[in-house]
Amino acid sequence: MADAAASPVGKRLLLLFADTAASASASAPAAAAASGDPGPALRTRAWRAGTVRAMSGAVPQDLAIFVEFDGCNWKQHSWVKVHAEEVIVLLLEGSLVWAPREDPVLLQGIRVSIAQWPALTFTPLVDKLGLGSVVPVEYLLDRELRFLSDANGLHLFQMGTDSQNQILLEHAALRETVNALISDQKLQEIFSRGPYSVQGHRVKIYQPEGEEGWLYGVVSHQDSITRLMEVSVTESGEIKSVDPRLIHVMLMDNSAPQSEGGTLKAVKSSKGKKKRESIEGKDGRRRKSASDSGCDPASKKLKGDRGEVDSNGSDGGEASRGPWKGGNASGEPGLDQRAKQPPSTFVPQINRNIRFATYTKENGRTLVVQDEPVGGDTPASFTPYSTATGQTPLAPEVGGAENKEAGKTLEQVGQGIVASAAVVTTASSTPNTVRISDTGLAAGTVPEKQKGSRSQASGENSRNSILASSGFGAPLPSSSQPLTFGSGRSQSNGVLATENKPLGFSFGCSSAQEAQKDTDLSKNLFFQCMSQTLPTSNYFTTVSESLADDSSSRDSFKQSLESLSSGLCKGRSVLGTDTKPGSKAGSSVDRKVPAESMPTLTPAFPRSLLNARTPENHENLFLQPPKLSREEPSNPFLAFVEKVEHSPFSSFASQASGSSSSATTVTSKVAPSWPESHSSADSASLAKKKPLFITTDSSKLVSGVLGSALTSGGPSLSAMGNGRSSSPTSSLTQPIEMPTLSSSPTEERPTVGPGQQDNPLLKTFSNVFGRHSGGFLSSPADFSQENKAPFEAVKRFSLDERSLACRQDSDSSTNSDLSDLSDSEEQLQAKTGLKGIPEHLMGKLGPNGERSAELLLGKSKGKQAPKGRPRTAPLKVGQSVLKDVSKVKKLKQSGEPFLQDGSCINVAPHLHKCRECRLERYRKFKEQEQDDSTVACRFFHFRRLIFTRKGVLRVEGFLSPQQSDPDAMNLWIPSSSLAEGIDLETSKYILANVGDQFCQLVMSEKEAMMMVEPHQKVAWKRAVRGVREMCDVCETTLFNIHWVCRKCGFGVCLDCYRLRKSRPRSETEEMGDEEVFSWLKCAKGQSHEPENLMPTQIIPGTALYNIGDMVHAARGKWGIKANCPCISRQNKSVLRPAVTNGMSQLPSINPSASSGNETTFSGGGGPAPVTTPEPDHVPKADSTDIRSEEPLKTDSSASNSNSELKAIRPPCPDTAPPSSALHWLADLATQKAKEETKEAGSLRSVLNKESHSPFGLDSFNSTAKVSPLTPKLFNSLLLGPTASNNKTEGSSLRDLLHSGPGKLPQTPLDTGIPFPPVFSTSSAGVKSKASLPNFLDHIIASVVENKKTSDASKRACNLTDTQKEVKEMVMGLNVLDPHTSHSWLCDGRLLCLHDPSNKNNWKIFRECWKQGQPVLVSGVHKKLKSELWKPEAFSQEFGDQDVDLVNCRNCAIISDVKVRDFWDGFEIICKRLRSEDGQPMVLKLKDWPPGEDFRDMMPTRFEDLMENLPLPEYTKRDGRLNLASRLPSYFVRPDLGPKMYNAYGLITAEDRRVGTTNLHLDVSDAVNVMVYVGIPIGEGAHDEEVLKTIDEGDADEVTKQRIHDGKEKPGALWHIYAAKDAEKIRELLRKVGEEQGQENPPDHDPIHDQSWYLDQTLRKRLYEEYGVQGWAIVQFLGDAVFIPAGAPHQVHNLYSCIKVAEDFVSPEHVKHCFRLTQEFRHLSNTHTNHEDKLQVKNIIYHAVKDAVGTLKAHESKLARS
């Protein structure tokens, strides 16, 4: 099993010295291998076995290891120089496997024949014999050594299942040996990598030079980054500094320590194990980043899947299991994997399809983490040493071992560690995913914590290691060049061979050579030696060759290996030499390659770059000054990537031979070109050609370099890599990586977007992978044909995925990753132009429900680990430029500014730290928060740094809006292709309902810009995936303009800034700490003065104003009425008519204007003639004078247009250039005219008939030929200004229904009905099938909404009229859709739909919904699986969970009760918990399932509920009318549920004054479904009490009838009030509170506090004093209650109920969401509703953006009409 640590310390080792090997020729082993029986010849050699106890050496030639040989006395243990002439073969412990065994085994004196026996494989570190494909194995227990001809008969040992193997169960000695081995490895992992600390534990330290061998002591301190530990020696009391990667340290149990020669026996301390498990689990919940794969819920599964999480952990059990599992047993030397891979990176493998998202709030920011189980393939991020000749990086983490110069102290060494970036590639056991981890980071560069986490991943990595061994040699210790990329993320793209051909990847590390020379880091002996060139015949090579079916591929592969070995830099070993074609596991076709498992490239740096890049090759993207123009659009951040031509394909392209026909062999071709490109000169030239940060545009990636190399066939995978990788080497890996692959491995999404289809890279990639069923990429067919950016991504990313994984490695992260966080995703997506699939659709794209979007996105972040990426997996942000000595040197010389690409702590600790970084040390959950440090940093990708002439790092400034790039812009502008889940009609409807709020937003932002002082520069804060930017004062989500402190990043929203600035300074000082909006202090306690803050915007450039432009243009073109602030301000006097008879009048038009004439206001004040053709069959009315403040000409003539109206657009006044932020205000008047021309003009002509009826009913009489257009026009009219709800005398409804044609009073036609039509209408010219009833309903609804009376007496007088109107309304709606089964409750005021699955429900539902009325849908329970929702089912499944209960009678909280206690008393009163007086309590479960865990905890119930929710258009997460679906997954997804509400019934008379849920309101719409009603048994019947409660609750007769006639089970009594009445209710409650002597603090609200239940007395008082009447609704089993946003409501359970609610955001009620968000700002910071989780402004923006984009895409229809 691979040792947990990357260092060889603690590993088993086999040595063959020259004197013992002289008798045999060096070729013997190879010959033996060819003959198929290499065993005997090798076995007879004098092999020396032992354990590595220490390591030393400052340069590769001096690398030495201290070996404790088996069976020798103390004096015979000695130091062995790894590269000494006498060392012929040096093999290091690899994976634990099941190996075939022919000879019987002697067990307890009995010989037993067993076919498979646990054995350790070994990986060559030095191989002068050329073992080739020979696999050395040492059987456990008797330690018999065997040499197998290949790895075909080996199967990876998997702790989860193999620990139960019969052999182990029967033989205790063998079982103990296996457990001891696993324990050793786990302990090494704990010592060597974070985030584990062994502080306070007893340890024993090996003393190579001492007489006693072991020294005992207690760890007094362990550095979380360098891992150096200070040990207090027990005997002497002195403090020793020890590096566990250089000297063997073992944990001791309380029992006396013992030394056991080769291995430690069960040394693992239980504490250590628990600690580790707790750490892994802990992280899970907080930050389920892909990296946390093993966390939390996932961890539960892990145990099942993998056996014990821990056990597999470093054991390679899991890690190495990849290649050996199932089909994987391709015989790859997967065994070695372990050895190669940084074993410690164990990532528990979780069910691939599982993904958990958590939203955690930290310091005002909410981060989303997704627990996507990483595919377990994540490569270890630590730096393994590169293995010589491509062998697996032996102890991958040796990299951890710092370069130790001879004179350096251990501490120095610790810090200087260079992780030779060994490529740890693991063939993931998961279906063939092979990952090459770019763990090129120097150990020093990667915070150990990361390593630790990575190390966890390494388990998976171990699988990767196979790949590594297969040719991905670890890049050597180029310490100086910390691989920036994924820092070891498993991102490296996994290689898949399509036709079972293994892919060989050579991972060269040559680029690092120079760097090595420059830096001490590179000196780490061990790493370097690892990198030294060894004969290419390593047995792994042979294996890979044998695996490859294609001889040509084999040859090329060999060549590549050879060239690598010979051509690599001198001190280094050829990393790729032994490339085995991706272990079979990785390559075999049968294996599925889950998209997630594929490593994603970070757009900036292809994985391959990692290993092989010369220091220069890999320039930090950010180095380049934003202003530099480059061939490719550069990200402002990416400043200066050295343009070394090293595009991964550069050299390779030219050299690749056509033989690479099999995609799998691609790498081999690339390899050859490698060495050459490494020369610094070459690299420089190469660099010039390709910026590292390649555009995601695949076409671009391919261009040039790939050019010739790619063959249409599917040639080299390498071509697929990001073109940007600067070093040729990278190309090797690249092949595997998808150019656009960089993001969340878990999103499986089509790989190739239409835009990319021509891209050879993509083609190749898709060809290679497309055939795999699980394939990493979906086939092109998945793509919609319209050019979607390959990344439908942005929008689509699931936040989950975005997880913060990136955060973790803040320090070590390289920019490549950086990009991943922000730019790269956007870039990719921008480049491809794909808009992105809504989050909700993402899961559907990939086979495993995993999403590859990120892959496409190019986020380096999610990279490959599909599943359970190790928590700390390196997949974080890439390493900072400042960690690379060569780059720092260049930056100092050039004096160029660069972007801060890491957290303040890691990048610029001596400069001002942002708030997040300053608080880092105080975090409660340190390990978890570590992950976020980089991404959560306020200055990450925001602040610009620069070196002064003296080399001192200083702040140069911040990014400006002009430095945004197309990729960043892509997130904020409509996609060129159609957005998913939104059609033409929906777009118009959204614009009609939400457009005004959007305009309000824009106006607000413009006002904010006016507040910016002339001398101030506006900065640009790029949106960071998975981070919700929040105001530090009121915690509202920051939408765009805000003000930021340059020193600490403190940010305030526009409202708080305005409030503070407008307050006199004296008043501000007096407020002190009691100020409602407390402004936090700056770094040194100074207060934040508004004038010192820096104005900052989030939306790049002028995107916001451009969308505003498009909104007005679209409204004009499509005839969508507007009532937005911008129009009303400019045309107020002209456009706002008086109201008559409930309808708004058309401004500037007298009653006869309806004669079909259109009026237009010309921008210049002159008349603008407009002709509006109308259908010939519509009679025209004579035009009359038009009254207007400005002269207007109207043309009363109407021309025939085949029933299609074509409005002639009035000339537009000159407008400012589009670039002007305010230019769209310029022609508001003209646009307004256009809108009216489109809608009202023709309508007027149609309706005209002497202007008699505003609705022109005459034109609809039976004999009239009605234009199909007419109804649509009418609907458009209704979309008009919702001006006034006031009505003058009479009711237009009554007049309409009771009067004959032409008898209604004449009124202007521009009506202001306050709600849009049921069928959103397209502009004039588009035919509609709607008919009279369709808009008759609008009229009816309008009347009902506007029928108001000022006081109770008036209401009483009008009772008769109201009843008539209700009947008429019911009649109208019945006519509207007679096929929708429904009835009316609450005296005709509440719609009840009877068939939840009727697809037409939305039509009638919308009419009531847009008026703010609740709606009831019955019968949902008939669709649900009833057995899932029974109390006993919950009790059985979750009974042991601890929960908090609330006593409904007194609101007391009862903590830490088993949930079983609650469920047992659900229907049996005698089993209920009792209060102090002995009475059974009425309880409700508090927040269960907790937080957002419903989906994760109860997946089956989640699916059952979501599939059967009524009105799916609104309620489903991807519903077309659910605006929350429009929020790109790039952002933190709002928590919309589902949430469960479980409570007993309040069944006594005293309980009628108490509520189960007190009066409150929600910021979003919700549907609440009654899934179970439990009628309690015992202590008397309560039916009569329940009926009395219903009667006193004001329920109507129809409802009561349901109980008597239908025998239905009533569950709960609801009282819901209209949102518009909330203020009146608030006023009453304040009044009652004062009467009762209660205080009313300003930061509290009687409704938001949920402290009141309106009993019968209060409800009566509310009606009498304020005229407010609500809806009394009895919710029966299966009833779904729809509650509008902002509507106050309360619930009283009649019986025990289980209810489940899902929130949504409907277009009709966005205005309430908008208003409530502002209300919540003023609540106290501790208030549950205080935080703005809905992000309503962002939702409005993106909904409008998508709607406008869709309308633009359909403009051709307008042209045709």
From Swiss-Prot:
- N-acetylalanine: which positions carry it? A2
Q: What class of enzyme is it?
A: oxidoreductase
Q: Positions modified as N6-acetyllysine? A: K361
The listed outcome for E1731K is: In DIJOS; uncertain significance
Where does the record place the region Disordered? 253-346, 370-394, 438-496, 572-603, 714-762, 805-827, 1142-1220
Annotated domain remarks: Leu-Xaa-Xaa-Leu-Leu (LXXLL) motifs are known to mediate the association with nuclear receptors.
Q: Which disease is it linked to?
A: Diets-Jongmans syndrome: An autosomal dominant disorder characterized by varying degrees of intellectual disability, developmental delay, short stature, and characteristic facial features such as a wide mouth, a pointed chin, long ears and a low columella.
State the organism named in the record. Answer: Homo sapiens
- Family affiliation: Belongs to the JHDM2 histone demethylase family.
What's the record's note on cofactor binding? Answer: Binds 1 Fe(2+) ion per subunit.
Example GO CC term: the record gives: chromatin
A GO biological process held by the record: regulation of transcription by RNA polymerase II
Subcellular location, record wording: Nucleus
Q: Which InterPro entries match?
A: DUF7030, JHDM2-like, JmjC_dom, KDM3AB_Tudor, PWWP_KDM3B
Q: Where is this cross-link: Glycyl lysine isopeptide (Lys-Gly) (interchain with G-Cter in SUMO2)?
A: K788
Q: Which residues carry this modification: Phosphothreonine?
A: T614
Also noted in the record is: Its gene is located in the 5q region of the genome which is deleted in del(5q) interstitial deletion, a frequent deletion found in myeloid leukemias and myelodysplasias, suggesting that it may be a good candidate for the del(5q) tumor suppressor gene.
Q: Which GO terms describe its molecular function?
A: antioxidant activity; chromatin DNA binding; histone H3K9 demethylase activity; histone H3K9me/H3K9me2 demethylase activity; transcription coregulator activity; zinc ion binding
EC number(s) stated in the UniProt entry for this protein: 1.14.11.65
**SMART domains linked:** JmjC (SM00558)
User: What single Pfam family name could you report for this chain, choosing any that match?
Assistant: DUF7030
> Residues that bind Fe cation, according to the entry?
H1560, D1562, H1689
- Tell me which residue ranges form C6-type zinc fingers: 1031-1056
Q: As annotated in Swiss-Prot or TrEMBL, what is the tissue specificity of this protein?
A: Ubiquitous. Highly expressed in placenta, skeletal muscle, kidney, heart and liver.
Role this protein plays: Histone demethylase that specifically demethylates 'Lys-9' of histone H3, thereby playing a central role in histone code. Demethylation of Lys residue generates formaldehyde and succinate. May have tumor suppressor activity.
> PANTHER family under this entry?
JMJC DOMAIN-CONTAINING HISTONE DEMETHYLATION PROTEIN (PTHR12549), LYSINE-SPECIFIC DEMETHYLASE 3B (PTHR12549:SF8)
**What is the name of this protein?**
Lysine-specific demethylase 3B
